Swiss-Prot record:
Catalyzed reaction equations: L-tyrosyl-[protein] + ATP = O-(5'-adenylyl)-L-tyrosyl-[protein] + diphosphate; O-(5'-adenylyl)-L-tyrosyl-[protein] + ATP = O-[5'-(adenylyl-(5'->3')-adenylyl)]-L-tyrosyl-[protein] + diphosphate
Binding note for cofactor: Binds 2 Mg(2+) ions.
Lineage of origin: Archaea, Methanobacteriati, Methanobacteriota, Methanomada group, Methanococci
Xref: Gene3D superfamilies: Beta Polymerase, domain 2
Protein name: Putative protein adenylyltransferase MJ0141
Cofactor: Mg(2+)
Species of provenance: Methanocaldococcus jannaschii (strain ATCC 43067 / DSM 2661 / JAL-1 / JCM 10045 / NBRC 100440) (Methanococcus jannaschii)
Motif GSX(10)DXD motif per UniProt: ranges: 29-43
One Gene Ontology term of the molecular function aspect: nucleotidyltransferase activity
Length: 99
């Protein structure tokens, strides 16, 4: 399965937890650039309208772990509030792949 399809499925699963809090999911890093190898992790930025609770974050990590085992990849989710603006967020928004 293509990485984009895996991340779309991941987004669908986390949206059941985050519901209206979820704004966007962006693939970034080596998989977005296309220069990944078998050691690369899958960097995923989760932009939210409102920060999830600790319990919701734990569920997201659990889902990422499940996907990592199922597809033999390491999904590394990072959660940011969409109103936070940093050079990191700007770079991900400019060069990442929205899923």
């Amino acid at each position: 399965m293509e990485i984009i399809e895996i991340i779309k499925e991941f987004k669908k699963d986390i949206s059941t937890i985050l519901k209206d809090k979820l704004d966007r999911v962006i693939l970034f890093g080596s998989y977005a650039r296309g220069d990944y190898d078998e050691e690369s992790d899958v960097d995923v930025l989760i932009l939210v309208k409102e920060m999830p609770t600790l319990k919701e974050k734990q569920k997201i990590i659990k889902i990422a772990s499940r996907y990592s085992l199922k597809y033999d990849i390491l999904i590394s989710p990072i959660i940011y509030k969409k109103t936070i603006k940093t050079s990191f967020i700007d770079e991900v928004e400019n060069y990442g792949v929205e899923v």
